[in-house]
């Protein structure tokens, strides 16, 4: 199979879809890999690094899409890429369709096979291709939250861990999954007072056992969230419903309950956001203020640490990429039910129910 790795063109997206080590594995199995020139530069990989493992370098993104049977990316295609995607071409990347109707319609029109990293799901309901980026995003959410609590950034001017004799910052984390757990670990390590919420009591019991003692757990309800808001300094939204839009856990009216300079970090923004007042921002303009509350809603948080996140992503995606390349998408998905759940839009049909339901589109079960 011919695999193409284009350069990401989303604002400040510095990751690349495959490391040289991943390319080497595919080449060893007899496949041909084309990489766009400088695609890996911001992740620390030069064109020479790819050439050394027998990748072919192409100058333009158009060339990569034109030649490849399968495209391996990081983020969803954006408008300039829509017309480049070919009928029957496999596109393996994060899509987050439920947050973007135009993207969904464009992929339907393309007749491509769109396999979304974020909905590949194992029998135990774990999300193996979302987990590594969730780990990065959770840790980054705390880092950026701490930065925007600084007064020059519009925050309250609080140090996360305080100092002897001065109370530390209070952090509320909505969602106790991979993102929330990693955010809590980082915040606790910085010395903050941390409260993490979830609706799953079994998960809360687990978190109580494994997280540091300065992390408390709370059942997630509207009442409980409202009770916490007047005293928090940083809120991290990390709620996930696989493949579906995130619920709004904090409304605009609830912003009035918080003190000016409180920071909201919406990690769920790529699934529509879990704050009513959230809209996507970029690394170049990451924040905005609504009713005195600082909002950070960058949709590609891990793109700020591309070396770490690219390595982690390829570690997770490579076995699936190899299976798709060696077997073809139909056989690979037939052999692996987890991978089959990644099929979101296939040859003009919406094949993931949550996406179809969000947009009122027809859902068609895929036959393998």
Report each predicted region and the residues it spans.
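Short glycine-/small-residue-rich Rossmann-like dinucleotide-binding loops
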Residues: 69, 75-76, 95-96, 221, ...
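An N-terminal-biased, well-structured beta-alpha scaffold segment characteristic
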Residues: 2-110
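Rossmann-like adenosine-cofactor binding region
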Residues: 209-291
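Glycine/serine-rich phosphate-binding loop and adjoining beta1-alpha1 elements at the start
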Residues: 2, 8, 77-169, 298-300
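Glycine-rich phosphate/diphosphate-binding loop of Rossmann-like nucleotide-binding domains
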Residues: 6-7, 11-45, 152-240, 287
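Adenosine-phosphate binding glycine-rich loop
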Residues: 118-144, 148-159, 269, 274-368
